[in-house]
Amino acid sequence: NKSADEFIVNSKTNGQLKVNVSGDLLLLDFPKDTLRNNSMHKEILEVLGVLPIELYEGRDDILAILDNEALVKTLKPDFSLLKNINKRGLIVSAEGSDCDFVSRCFFPSTGVDEDPVTGSAHTTLTPYWSNKLGKKKLHAKQLSERGGVLYCEEKNSRVIIGGKAVKYMQGNIYL
């Protein structure tokens, strides 16, 4: 029973995504998101109860940058107000104390108030923090209740996102 070092996942929104196995990490290869300034400061202040220091809009989500990790960790967003924002969700981030950056991701319009670890959000976060910190390889933490650690790398028009995974199912498909 040989394990594959590389395989392809077909995604409805991102096309074919290449997955590489490197040691105990799974590395996913995503298209990089492009950020534009967003002017919804008042609406995001109402949702979060804190004013972001920077606010952007990506392909699917709004990215709010906060002053520090403690603010990100202690947020209690108003999910009913967040549902009214015309995007999939809200990514909140700050520079990390023991990593490059931290984040939390809220998607109540999809039925998920807070996603525990969000690979797709890091296609938005990685270009922002890579530019801000002046480095291509980044170490990130998502501060949801379950939490997670991600390894991110900006590579031209792509973002490589890696993390550890636990096998929860095994089987065979017969065609």
PLM segments and residue spans:
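Active-site proximal loop and beta-alpha junction motif in alpha/beta enzyme cores
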Residues: 1-175
